[in-house]
Regions:
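Sensory coupling linkers of modular signal transduction proteins
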Residues: 106-139
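Basic, amphipathic alpha-helical hairpins
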Residues: 140-153, 172, 193-202, 222, ...
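N-terminal capping loop/helix in small sensory signaling domains highlighted by a polar->aromatic N-x2-3-F motif
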Residues: 37-41
Length: 239
């Protein structure tokens, strides 16, 4: 029977992945159970400890249709077809999502036997999203990302899409099951979560950069969406 990979990846490699807040990384065994994930992965699923993931599979963490998609990718890798730089929409625990590039490769033991899979997915920047014709409403999402800290009107977003405000509403509902405003609010919250953990910015600075009216609005909205205050969230992941 093949010897499984060590649960802990090399320290330097793990440290590198921990300082890349826009990259989720993981290692799984041949059955699809997680052996290791980085902090960005935990944050994406609203978790705080590695022990909450180790031994679990995608079906334990994601809706059935997403889990089936992830598992199909793993099986492709195990069958000798690595996933390289694939464009996909990656969901979060709050039912929002962002566009990413995903790579999955085989994991091998010291004898070269395939014992599982490793992978990472990187969140795309505004420039990347805006340049990809295959991303639905990419120009609008890129505008949202660039204008995250300021005000952006429905008319401006509609012009970026080359349609009317009503047409934009219908397009977002069709492609993302959200209104443009709902998508923008969740995008702001995702970015705030990332900045709370990956930067030393004050709560007021994070609130300003992510487009919240002031820190009190930030605190209220953040607690409503995550169940905790921004300060508690930072302590949860950073300590």
């Amino acid at each position: 029977m093949p010897k499984p990979p060590k649960q802990n990846t090399p320290l330097a490699f793990r440290e590198l992945l921990e300082v890349m807040p826009d990259v989720q990384a993981w290692m799984k065994d041949r059955e699809g159970s997680y052996l290791w994930v980085n902090t960005a992965f935990l944050m994406n699923y609203g978790l705080t400890r590695l022990s909450q993931v180790v031994g679990k599979a995608d079906r334990d963490l994601s809706p059935a249709h997403l889990a089936a998609h992830f598992e199909a990718g793993d099986q492709a890798v195990l069958s000798g077809r690595p996933v390289n730089h694939r464009l996909e929409l990656v969901g979060r625990y709050d039912h929002s999502a962002h566009w990413c590039r995903t790579t999955k490769l085989p994991a091998r033991d010291e004898r070269g036997t395939m014992v599982g899979t490793v992978g990472f997915t990187r969140r795309l920047t505004a420039a990347e999203v805006g340049q990809m014709a295959e991303i639905p409403l990419g120009a609008v999402i890129a505008t949202m990302i660039r204008r995250l800290g300021g005000k952006v009107t429905s008319g401006e977003l509609a012009r970026a899409a080359g349609t009317s405000v009503r047409g934009l509403e219908r397009a977002f509902d069709r492609d993302y099951c959200l209104s443009p405003r709902q998508y923008l609010r969740r995008l702001r919250m995702q970015t705030a979560c990332q900045q709370l953990v990956s930067t030393r910015s004050t709560l007021a600075q994070v609130a300003d950069r992510c487009g919240f009216a002031d820190q009190s609005h930030f605190n209220r909205d953040f607690k409503r969406m995550t169940g905790m205050t921004p300060r508690a969230y930072r302590l949860k992941f950073v300590g």
